[in-house]
Amino acid sequence: SGDVLDFLERRLADGVSRRDPELDDIPFTGGYVGFLGYECKALTLGPNAHCSELPDAMWMRPASWIAYDHYRHHAHLLALDDRDTPGCNEAADLLDALAATLVKRPGSSEEPAPLTVPVEGSWRLSRGGYQDRVAAIQQALTRGDSYEACLTDTWTSRCDVDGWRLYRALRRRNPAPYGAYLRFTDPRVEVCSSSPERFLRVRDGIAESKPIKG
């Protein structure tokens, strides 16, 4: 019961995100990975003006993963350990499978093939609709209702392209410190992200935000 924020809060309270002091130098030691769509603002800020065709939120808890320290250039292989089951070797099996996958894959230094895809799409807002919103924002700023506003729009396109190749092309053209590629299978959703901003990071009771607007 409850919404996705309630679910994540319960799972984190159960110790999913509990960190082992011996692993403090590793960037990610387990937990949930996913996204909250813009529509999730309705959970705390009132109803939305429009709805998305995509899920409002999707999260997963990986059983095994690679944590790469870009500062030290160290890669760490990790897996969940079922300590409640004596003799369980699932974590070791997951690590072996992960290591075998790395051996089979080409090196990360290999230059990916150029990605050229003819793309046609459309904006959600018309030119006139966008201009009307700009005018409304200017009036709000003049009245003193806000000192800053971020007007965004959605561009939609349909094309046949592999999401992982698209993400790698995005990172080449727009390298940024906060990038992500997520792939979900049910329903099929892929997220490619490359941003210079850190929205929010909370660790040990300290919250950090690194916006660039303003």
Regions found by a protein language model. Name each.
Residues 1-214:
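Extended alpha-helical targeting/anchoring segments
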